[in-house]
Amino acid sequence: MKSYFVTMGFNETFLLRLLNETSAQKEDSLVIVVPSPIVSGTRAAIESLRAQISRLNYPPPRIYEIEITDFNLALSKILDIILTLPEPIISDLTMGMRMINTLILLGIIVSRKRFTVYVRDEGGGSRVISFNDNTIRALMRDYSREEMKLLNVLYETKGTGITELAKMLDKSEKTLINKIAELKKFGILTQKGKDRKVELNELGLNVIKLNKSVIESSKSSEELVKENKGKEVNIPY
């Protein structure tokens, strides 16, 4: 079971597309939040949605109207709804008022629930991007200095094999394999080829950008690699 949590404007097309592309089932939950008082255009779109949902075997919508006069009061109402919903939560930020969509996005993130959020081309094109709770968790995580040294070596070398990485960091291959497996769970590393070369993906590169201060406060990985050629460099995990 999954929960759809969205707002809605004057057209139900994007929502129907979301339900179709994510294989919505009747037992799922569909919650639509709209600003109060609801306007006639949105009301008409909701009625059209109800008519189509009844024949498509999608979940019936529950409609919530909320007043938006204060950020914290509005966010509180959003959280009251989100926190009761089963996971994962699915949302599409292409529909309705930007103000409501902003509150929905913030509410979903701070709720710490599992989620996937979609953003589509408002012009009706095929472009769509998405991200989920794993993405946010990877970006917001407090990485240790030692983890950042490892990630920065991968950044500076543009990826390397386990054996070479172990030599650079003066660590056993087993230790690094375990650490890399741990970091891969956050979706920031990939391993390719016969030699299982370890590389940062785009998400990993964003983690590097967000943690530059951690990297710059310690020796650069370039210096680390150079020093390791002549003497031992011990970096405890």
UniProtKB/Swiss-Prot annotation:
The keyword Signal does not apply. Keywords: Antiviral defense, DNA-binding. The keyword DNA-binding applies. GO terms for biological process: defense response to virus. CDD domains: CasRa_I-A. NCBIfam families: cas_HTH. Belongs to the CRISPR-associated Csa3 family. Homodimer. This is CRISPR locus-related putative DNA-binding protein Csa3. It comes from Saccharolobus solfataricus (strain ATCC 35092 / DSM 1617 / JCM 11322 / P2) (Sulfolobus solfataricus). The gene is csa3.
